[in-house]
Structures are given as C-alpha cells and as structure tokens.
From Swiss-Prot, chain B:
<dbReference type="GO" id="GO:0005179">
    <property type="term" value="F:hormone activity"/>
</dbReference>
<dbReference type="InterPro" id="IPR009079">
    <property type="entry name" value="4_helix_cytokine-like_core"/>
</dbReference>
<dbReference type="GO" id="GO:0008284">
    <property type="term" value="P:positive regulation of cell population proliferation"/>
</dbReference>
<feature type="signal peptide">
    <location>
        <begin position="1"/>
        <end position="24"/>
    </location>
</feature>
<dbReference type="GO" id="GO:0046427">
    <property type="term" value="P:positive regulation of receptor signaling pathway via JAK-STAT"/>
</dbReference>
<keyword id="KW-0964">Secreted</keyword>
<keyword id="KW-0732">Signal</keyword>
<feature type="disulfide bond">
    <location>
        <begin position="202"/>
        <end position="212"/>
    </location>
</feature>
<dbReference type="GO" id="GO:0031667">
    <property type="term" value="P:response to nutrient levels"/>
</dbReference>
<keyword id="KW-0372">Hormone</keyword>
<protein>
    <recommendedName>
        <fullName>Prolactin</fullName>
    </recommendedName>
</protein>
<feature type="disulfide bond">
    <location>
        <begin position="70"/>
        <end position="185"/>
    </location>
</feature>
<keyword id="KW-1015">Disulfide bond</keyword>
<dbReference type="Pfam" id="PF00103">
    <property type="entry name" value="Hormone_1"/>
</dbReference>
<dbReference type="InterPro" id="IPR001400">
    <property type="entry name" value="Somatotropin/Prolactin"/>
</dbReference>
<dbReference type="InterPro" id="IPR018116">
    <property type="entry name" value="Somatotropin_CS"/>
</dbReference>
<dbReference type="GO" id="GO:0005615">
    <property type="term" value="C:extracellular space"/>
</dbReference>
C-alpha cells in the first residue's frame, strides 16, 4: 500500500514537474540541412537550420559518412563558415564521392537527428563573385562605350582547367530599374555600346561553372559617361544651316519664276481672239484704231464709218458679163484685204455699187449705228450670223452681220464659184466692210464663212441714201456686184454646195429675203430660179436673176428687179425667212426694219412678181 | 537527329583522322571540340536524371543502391584536384576512353529499357537516352583517333564490363530503381570525362590562355 502511494506520488511528481517549470523543456527540434556549397570544387561547406531548441541549450553535431566506407566522421570545422555550419577543407573533401551527412541537435533532454543528405561535391559548386571589376569609358570614332573587365574569383582555379567559368554582366542607368544583361562566355572582358551621354551607369558581373550554380553579383561599379552632346549639337547646327540655305534658294527660285508658275498653276483663260484685234484699244474706246487693226489683218475695215453712208437706198445689183471678170475681181477681192472705207464717191456707175442709194436706207444705217456696232462686234464672232452690211462710211449700209455667211459658197468646190461666193460673202459679211468703200470689202473670203453656212443670206439695210453699196473701185464694184449677185443667188442656198455651184456661175441670181431678224436685218437668200417647188436643183439657176435693185419704195421695200427672163422663175415663191424649202427658194420681198415690221415683210413678200425678190428694205432700219 | 549525330561523329572522326595523318589541326582545337561534346553529354544526363527524379517516389531513395556499386567504380580515378592535376595527359585520356568504352553496352540496355519504362516522361527520357548513346559513341570514336597523338599510354583501355544483365527486373519499382541507379552512375562518369577533357584542353592550349 505504501509502495503504491510512493509510486503514485513519484508519478505525480514526474508529471507535474515540467508543468511546475512552466516553459516546458523538450528535446531539441529536428535540425535541417538546408544547403551545402563548394566554391571551387576543392572544399565545401554545409549549413543547417536548427529546429526548436526545446528551451534548453542545444548543441549541434554534424556527422558524415563517405560512400566508400562505413566510417562516420564528425565535422572537422564548425567555426570557419559561421554559425550552424560545417566547413570541409581540402583534405576532407573528396570529389566524385557521395557524402551522407547528418546533423544532430542535442540538449539536456535528448538529441534529435536530422534527415540525412547525400551530396556530391561536384554538383554543388557555386563560385564566389568575380573580383576586381573595372569599368572604363573608351571612344570608338567619337562614340563612347564601356569596357568592363574583371578577374575570376581568386579561389577558383581556372588556369589548370580544373574549373571552367562563364560570366555574365549586367548594366543599367542610375535612374532606371531594369538591368541589361549580357552573356560574356569565358572571356574576362566585355564592351557595352549604345550609351546615353552624360549618364551614370551601374555595372555588375557574376560567374558560373560549367555545371554549377551562378555566383552572387559582384559589387556595383559606377561609371559616368561624359557628355558628347555638343558633338551632336554641332551636327544639328550644320543640318539647320544647310536646310535654311536650301530654303532660301528655293524661295528665291520661286520668286524668280513666280510668273511662269502662275501661268502653270492658273493659266489664263483664253478669250476669243481675233487676229488683229487689240483688246487694249477696245478698252480704251478707240474703236477706229481697233477696227482698223482688224482691217489690216484681213478683217473688214471698221474705221469710223458713217452708218448713214452705208445705207443705200437701193441695191443695185449688176450682173457682170463675164464671169471671169467677176472671178478675177472676186479673187482680187478675195485675196486682198479690203479696207472698209466708205467713200461717198461712187465711181461705180451703177453696177450695184454700194453707194447706190437704192440699196440701203440711210435711216437704217444711222439709226442702227449702235446696233451695228454691236453687230460688228458680233460679226467677228458670229461667222454664221447674219451680217448686216453696215458701213458707216460706206454708202451701203448693210448690217454688219449680214455679210457673214455664204458658207455654202465657200465650201464650194469650184474655185471660181467659191471665189465668187467669197467675194460675195465678203461683201456681205462685212459689216465693217464698207460696200461703198472701194476696195477691200471682201476680206477674208473664207473668214468664218468657209464653213458651210447654212443659209447664206445677207441682209441689207436699206437706207435712203443708198451709198454705194459696192465699193467704188471698179473691181470692187464688179466684184461686189458679183458678190451681190452671187450672194443673192446664193442666199437661201441652203442646199448642198453642189447646188451652189451652178447658181454661182450664174451671174444673175435671185435674192430672196430669207428672213428679217430682229435687228431689222434682212436676210436674203438666193433663189434658184427656175426651180420648182419640188425639184429645184439649185444648180440651175435658170435664167432668172435679179440683182438689180429696182428701187426702194416708201415702205422701205427693196425692190429687186429681175434682169432676165422669168420664164423659169420659180413658181414657188414665198418668202420663207427660214425657207427651208428643199430646193427652192423663192424670192420674197423683204421688208426689213423692225421686227414688228417683219411680218409685213412676209406679207409683202409677194410683192415681187414673177418670182422677184423684192428685197424691200427688209431689214432693219425700222427705228431710224 | 540520329543521322545528324552520326554524321557529326563521322565528321569528327574524319577530322581527327586527318589530324592524325597530317597533324594540321592543332590538338587544342580538337580537345576543345571533344570537351564541348562531353559538356553536352553531361548536361543531357543531368537533365535526364532530373526528369526521372520528378516522378521518382521519394521512398525509393532508401533502397537506392549506392553509387559505389557502379560497374565503373573499379576504375581508379583521381578523387581530388591535386591528384587529378598530377595525372599525365595520356593517362587522363586513357581514363576517359575507358569510361566511354565501359558505357557503350549499358547505354544500349538503357535505351532498350527506356522504351518501355513505366514513367510519365518516358518519351523524353527515351529520346534523351538515344542522344546519349550517339554522343558517347561519337566521342569515343573521336578520342580513339586522337589518342594516337598522346603516346602508347593513351592506347590502353581498362575493361569495365557491365554485369547488370540485359533484363532489368520485371517489376515496376525495381525497373525504375535500376534505371535511376544506372543514370546516376552515368551522370557521374560523364562529369569525370568532362572534367578530364577540360583539363587536357587547358594543358594543350598553353598559347591560348583564354580557353581555360
């Protein structure tokens, strides 16, 4: 019983003793060998991590065993490598041999063994960092670069080839946070390019054995790259100067060629250009010079003319005997540039001279000066337009616009005829062209009229005064007559040129008032005499021609007289102002003057008997 | 890849043969070439071992046969640096050649075994073993030619027969264990070969200190 109590008490004592202490001692916790390293493959060190110490002072011991023997050795050196470490020196280190290492922690209460670790020295090599890292700044063609050089760790025996190290360097700018890593292989020197001028660089180097672990990074080396900005700047300055120079040159060139450039970029709008027409003169208002210039260049002369003079009371149309003469005349006229001069003198004895008062009305001309002016101007541009022969100075006051067209004739293949026509056309077409003026009425035969002017018509402005419509010169006169003849005949010859031919040949032809335009211009068209309604081949101007102006009656009706027989007068006669009868153009009297009177024109068309064309004052002159 | 390796080895042999014939190529370059190959060899074996370890059951460690039981352990190789540096070049070369020779057959067995190895990374392991085989063969052939330059001592090769048997045990654990054991033996021996060749290279390249 007592024994039981004693045992019980002892037991209690044993149980409570630890609790009485409060801290609770225990055998040490299990230490762990966390790493072993060899810096040069000749020695190595192992470090362990102690476990809990159990509240009591604990001692550690490391025991190892080589694979070749069963002998257990204790760590020879606990202090060289620091606390909780074991250093194996060269004598104790064998390579290509497995070590079985165990750490034992011991305290008063007991000891604890760590887990054993097998290591082979050759597999745990981690060298020291490279030593004596130097960085210098060198220049490569004025561009700086870093040269980094170092030494292997002094312990590592690379000379004999026992350990082979490869290196790595890393560089960064002071203010940056990312490193730039370069692999340097086995060499002990490295160049770093692409530096920023004026920056401070940090350089570090580390190494690794061929089959081992990387060393720690060496201590940082600082290097400052000198400024080479000024060198860059000088280059920039050069570039700026050069470009400024080039810019100046370009500006100067541009300035020099500004005109041509302007022409290139904004070409001037071409305006209508009349040969010999001087815009400046026109602007200045000097019409005489202007028109004289035109006359010079084959234009109907438009010197100041007296419209009144231009007007003729009646148109005297003569049929020249010989065609050749006419032709010649025509040619002359054709060739020459006839100035428009209206001379009052009428040397023409009455062959349809411009000055003939019977042709044109004076009033017409006077009144229509303005209109003529405009007409004249128009004339140039409107080739096909009606030309009213309106010559101020000329006796014949024809509207400027009357004269233009006889395109058909111009297109006539027959030269003579064409020339004839030309002549006529000239005569007709020139407003400026003073029919009364001697010479050059006929300007440019083909001027503007070469083309097939549909209707050839010519308007006459009949005026009282009938200045000689035809130019004073005989030639001209004749030609004029011829012209008039031709014109007359050709007027209204809308037909094919073929048709024109024959009528052209015929000296005497009809003149038919084609129409009266609003300017009181009488458009005459030749009538093919003898052509019936249907089948008038214009080619046969039968013997009807009238180019004889009989007179102008009071109503400003130009009366034309037919010269010859009238047998074949065209039965179909009626006025068509735009008579588009196929082949037949009949003459019609034309009362000109105004539009209002245009109607009457038609009415009076039948004035003429026998197919005459009573070219009364067709046109125009209404308002005078 | 295999053809490339054989071509490479052939080329290497040709080069060495030419060297033997004409001695136009310096030894240091040849040794440099050889050490590069051995370096590759060892790296491969290290990778292979790590692949094996990734899935190797830790408990297998306990029953891992000790490395001293490698079939090449009878070969006396230097165990530290002083000893290694005292060995002559011819002897070093002879050691290297012996080791290479000793591993030709076991590697074949390993290669065969790797095809059916019960391991998750069996494919890559098999490929790597194949490479090992080729590298070893080419290196051995090259060094056979090179040894002519080093004198008669380099010609002697110790015979280290492998007696492990063709058929590594039947059960899975045993097979894996054996495979792992062989690989660890080979890893060490390849490191030896590499180290010796690099020492030789450094010795031969007296005029080129940067090689060391």
């Amino acid at each position: 019983m007592k024994k039981v109590v004693e045992v019980f008490l002892l037991f209690l004592l044993l149980v409570f003793t630890p609790h009485a202490k409060g801290t609770g001692n225990s055998p040490p916790g299990k230490p762990t060998l966390n790493r072993c390293r060899s810096p040069e493959k000749e020695t190595f060190t192992c470090w362990w991590e102690p476990g809990s110490d159990g509240g009591l002072p604990t001692t550690f011991a490391l025991y190892y065993r080589k694979e070749t023997s069963e002998t257990v050795y204790e760590c020879p050196d606990y202090h060289t490598a620091g606390k909780n470490s074991c250093f194996f020196n060269k004598n104790d280190t064998s390579i290509w041999v497995n070590y079985n290492i165990t750490v034992v922690a011991t305290n008063a209460l007991g000891s604890t063994f760590s887990d054993p670790v097998d290591i082979d020295v050759v597999y745990i090599v981690k060298p020291n960092p490279p030593e004596r890292v130097t960085v210098i700044v060198l220049e490569d063609k004025s561009w700086p670069f870093l040269r980094v050089s170092w030494e292997p760790p002094h312990k590592a025996d690379t000379r004999s080839g026992w350990i082979t190290l490869v290196y790595q360097i890393r560089v960064k700018l002071e203010q940056e946070k990312d490193w730039e890593t370069h692999h340097a292989g086995q060499q002990k020197m490295f160049n770093v390019f692409s530096l920023r001028s004026g920056g401070t660089y940090l350089v570090q180097v580390r190494c690794k054995p061929d089959h081992g672990f990387w060393s720690e990074w060496s201590s940082t080396s600082y290097v400052k790259v000198p400024d080479y900005f000024h060198r860059e700047k000088s280059v920039w300055i050069l570039i700026m100067v050069f470009s400024a120079f080039i810019f100046l040159i370009l500006t100067w060139l541009l300035h020099m060629n500004s005109h041509s450039l302007k022409h290139c970029i904004l070409p001037p709008v071409p305006g209508p250009k009349i040969k010999g027409f001087d815009n400046q003169l026109l602007k200045n208002g000097k019409s005489e010079e202007l028109f004289s210039a035109l006359v010079v260049s084959d234009f109907p002369p438009t010197t100041s003319y007296n419209y009144e003079d231009l007007l003729v009371e009646y148109l005297e149309v003569n049929v020249p005997e010989e065609q050749e003469l006419m032709l010649e005349e025509n040619k002359d006229l054709h060739d020459g540039c006839l100035k428009s001069e209206c001379s009052t003198s009428d040397s023409d004895s009455g062959r349809g001279s411009c000055d003939s008062h019977t042709l044109l009305m004076d009033k017409c001309g006077e009144a229509k000066e303005e209109e003529r002016q405009t007409d004249q101007e128009r004339m140039g541009t409107e080739a096909e337009d009606m030309v009213s022969p309106d010559m101020s100075s000329g006796r014949v006051k024809t509207w400027p616009s009357v004269f233009s067209p006889l395109p058909q004739y111009s297109s006539n293949t027959l030269d003579e005829q064409s020339s004839l026509e030309m002549a006529k056309q000239h005569y007709l077409s020139d407003s400026q062209f003073l029919p009364s003026s001697t010479s050059s009425y006929l300007t440019q035969p083909g001027h503007g009229t070469k083309e097939a002017l549909g209707p050839s018509y010519w308007e006459f402005c009949l005026s009282n005064k009938q200045p000689h419509l035809l130019h004073p010169q005989t030639q001209a006169r004749q030609q004029l007559q011829a012209h008039s003849d031709v014109d007359i005949s050709s007027i209204g010859r809308k037909q094919a040129p073929a048709g024109l031919q024959s009528p052209l040949l015929r000296p005497t032809e009809y003149v038919e008032v084609q129409r009266v335009n609003e300017e009181d211009m009488v458009h005459l068209q030749p009538v093919v005499s003898g052509c019936g309604q249907n089948n008038c081949s214009p080619q046969m101007p039968q013997g009807e021609d009238y180019s004889k102006v009989k007179g102008v009656d009071s109503d400003n009706v130009l009366l034309l007289q037919r010269n010859m027989m009238e047998e074949d007068r065209c039965p179909c006669e009626h006025q068509e102002t735009n008579g588009v009868k196929e082949n037949c153009y009949t003459s019609s009297t034309v009362t000109t003057t105004q539009k209002p009177t245009a109607m009457p024109v038609q009415d009076e068309m039948v004035l003429g008997m026998n197919g005459y064309v009573d070219t009364a004052t067709m046109c125009i002159l209404p308002t005078y | 890849m295999a053809q490339r390796k054989t071509n490479g080895s052939k080329l290497f042999m040709m080069v060495l043969y030419m060297v033997a014939a004409c001695s136009a190529i310096p030894i240091s370059d040849l040794l440099d070439r050889a050490s590069q190959r051995s370096d590759t060899l060892h790296s491969l074996s290290t990778t292979l071992t790590q692949d094996l370890d990734s899935h190797f059951p830790p408990m297998g460690r306990v029953i891992t046969p000790r490395p001293s039981m490698c079939h090449t352990s009878s070969l006396h190789t230097p165990i530290d640096k002083e000893q290694a540096l005292q060995v002559s070049e011819a002897d070093l070369l002879s050691l290297v050649r012996s080791l290479l020779q000793a591993w030709r057959d076991p590697l074949v067995i390993l290669s065969t075994s790797a095809n059916t190895l019960p391991h998750p990374a069996q494919n890559s392991i098999s490929t790597k073993v194949q490479e090992l085989l080729e590298h070893t063969k080419s290196l051995g052939d090259g060094l056979d030619i090179l040894s002519g330059k080093f004198g008669p001592a380099a010609q002697s090769i110790s015979s280290l027969p492998y007696r492990g048997g063709n058929d590594i045990s039947q059960d899975r654990i045993s097979r894996l264990t054996n495979f792992h054991f062989l690989m660890s033996c080979f890893r060490r021996d390849s490191h030896k070969i590499d180290s010796f060749l690099k020492v030789l290279r450094c010795r031969a390249a007296k005029l080129q200190p940067e090689m060391c």
